[in-house]
Amino acid sequence: MCIRDRVRCLTRLIEPTSGSVIIDDTDITKISRNSLLDLRRNKMSMVFQHFGLFPHRTVLENISYGLEIRGEKKQERLDKATESLNLVGLKGWHNNYPRELSGGMQQRVGLARAMAVEPEILIFDEPFSALDPLIRREMQDELLDIQKKLQRTMVFITHDFLEAIKMGDHIAIMKDGEISQVGTPEEIVANPVDKYVKDFCEDVPKYKVLSAGKVMRKECSD
């Protein structure tokens, strides 16, 4: 199962063959088609690896697209789009087109578009993998700052374990379409359940992840 298949399972664009997807105590694998469409439209939003921007639309028009599809009035959607634009640090770029932006700026537009619809859940499909390392770190830090402000549930999919440790408070490591281990970064690095997970953790600077209590040994009393 590739990453995009996992994303599609979360949103039921591909029907899971087994298991459950629980959102707000509801198993969405069992809800009606209309309820599912409402969930996707109003509670979920996605940020793609390759931005997915419309080249013929301005930055502000790209950001407001989801609101347009939802049927919101023009002024309302422009106000929300402008707020999202400012949040990602692109104030003043509203009338530019995607071709006039750098890769990092385009990804900011993609992020702003996802946030403009005010979703409860943001799904990130390897959003920064196409960026150079410096811009990638900037975007990671910016997203963490935005998360502190918005307090949204974020599902961040990546092949980079160091990125997962930086971005996630809980991590699920998958192999062949199945979850190998779920835990905090500290739990996974300190106690990998098998060789596959241990190999993931091999090059991790453990001092960045583990607390002193995890590595200290209790002194034996005589």
Give a label for each model feature.
Residues T11:
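Helix-to-loop junction immediately C-terminal to a conserved catalytic motif
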Residues T26-D27, S64, E68, Q75-W93, ...:
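Conserved ABC ATPase "signature" region
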Residues I28-S45, I69, Q75, P192:
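ABC ATPase NBD coupling module
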Residues Y97-L101, M105:
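Conserved ABC ATPase signature
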Residues A116-E120:
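A short, proline-enriched helix->beta-strand linker immediately N-terminal to the Walker B motif
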Residues V182-G183, N191:
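ABC ATPase "signature
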